Amino acid sequence: MSHVSHSDFLPKAALPTFSSHAIEMNIHRIPGLAEHFVYFNDDMFPIRPMPETAFFRDGQPCTCGEEHPIGLIGEIGIWQHAAVNDLGVVNAHFNKRKQVKKFGKKYVNRVYRWQDNIRTKAVEKLFPDYFTGFKNLHAPAAYTKSTFEAVWNAEPELLKRTTLHRFRCADDVNQWVCLWWQIASGNFAPFNTDNFVSCADESTVDNLCRIICEQSHDMLCVNDPEKAVDFDSLALRLRKAFESILPNKSGFEK
């Protein structure tokens, strides 16, 4: 385990930063980072051993390539603005008709749920010229540094602007632009994400605790719920569940 400071990979002009977008768009600059890497947020937990093929196959990042239109209903937050900006970058640099013709079997694939394949085919018929968005889970993302470099080469001013914002802004892009770039370019291996589960509130915590104790899924994300919850009670229940499978501290913990 290596401790990395923002000053190790961000330009001086961007420091200090309080923007996850600025950090995300420069993680490929972390000294010593491998070409193939997996990006986790701090609320994501593997709960059973996972093989390398859960993240990379034949050198390609594993991800879900099904098309899923961006939902812009109700209050629009920063992440929705970023998603629209990400999609604009992808559509500016990729011809959907050509990519679907070339990589169609990755966008509609038997590893996905049949309902998702039907939606993708419907979206391809309704919007043949432009990508409308892709399925996003709040889950670890497999990347190559080459993807980040390609996006920087394609949109240097946009990414510089995102990097220099001290706080997240509506005209930023985020790491999804690289994830979606991989999908649009066909540089990915189709992957079923049903073994990734997310969120924690009063209605889901019992199921999450059961999943942890039984280690029935690969990955768990204890995401922030949108509505107010009894945080202390939920945290205690989740902590007990985690301690049932991880009773001892790791060598990195005090």
Regions found by a protein language model. Give the residues of each.
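Long, charge-rich alpha-helical interaction segments
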Residues: 62-163
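Long, low-complexity C-terminal extensions of enzymes
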Residues: 14, 142-254
